[in-house]
Amino acid sequence: MYDYIKGKLSKITAKFIVVETAGLGYMIYVANPYSFSGYVNQEVTIYLHQVIRDDAHLLFGFHTENEKEIFLNLISVSGIGPTTALAIIAVDDNEGLVSAIDNSDIKYLTKFPKIGKKTAQQMILDLSGKFVEASGESATSRKVSSEQNSNLEEAMEALLALGYKATELKKVKAFFEGTNETVEQYIKSSLKMLMK
């Protein structure tokens, strides 16, 4: 099994990205492939989950370990496969999903692709209370998350002051959510994306 891959992002399609390392190109299915568009031909680190089937070995990739943990929780539910779990992650913020499960909000959960009432009920039964670690609810995690967000916000404000538009920065900010960098590192990495 693979935990993560580090290599050059060589290709982006509507469903997957390709990361090249040691002369091999790995096809990795991700929730929002175009969120990686600023990193083509640059080194990236993608967290992985491997699914082995009779007819294929598939890799699913994630921006952060938290996103991967949520995916793993989702596929543990009867009726939710990797593709459906990825679709859920693609159309929702993690907080909304966690809140819906913990509050038994079936109506909210059935808005997701391929999630009917029965599967939504199963999600609530199986996952209620299990997203605490993945969503960063411990005191330590909240503190770290707050510091990360503060640095990221400061970097975005600096880029706004440099003349970049909020619409341009929205995609950049989304890419770095959940990462842990200094203000200077965020600015430097963001500029690389914006200059592509």
From Swiss-Prot:
A GO BP entry: DNA repair
Organism annotation: Streptococcus agalactiae serotype V (strain ATCC BAA-611 / 2603 V/R)
SMART domains in the cross-refs: HhH1
GO CC terms of this entry: cytoplasm; Holliday junction helicase complex; Holliday junction resolvase complex
Keyword DNA repair assigned: yes
Protein name as catalogued: Holliday junction branch migration complex subunit RuvA
SUPFAM superfamilies, per database record: DNA helicase RuvA subunit, C-terminal domain, Nucleic acid-binding proteins, RuvA domain 2-like
Flexible linker: annotated segments: 143-148
Keywords: Cytoplasm, DNA damage, DNA recombination, DNA repair, DNA-binding
GO molecular function, one term: ATP binding
Subunit details: Homotetramer. Forms an RuvA(8)-RuvB(12)-Holliday junction (HJ) complex. HJ DNA is sandwiched between 2 RuvA tetramers; dsDNA enters through RuvA and exits via RuvB. An RuvB hexamer assembles on each DNA strand where it exits the tetramer. Each RuvB hexamer is contacted by two RuvA subunits (via domain III) on 2 adjacent RuvB subunits; this complex drives branch migration. In the full resolvosome a probable DNA-RuvA(4)-RuvB(12)-RuvC(2) complex forms which resolves the HJ.
Name of the gene this protein is made from: ruvA
Protein location: Cytoplasm
Domain I as annotated region, ranges: 1-63
Record Pfam families: HHH_5, RuvA_C, RuvA_N
Keyword Flavoprotein in annotation: no
Disulfide linkage: none
Region (Domain III): 148-196
Segments for region (Domain II): 64-142
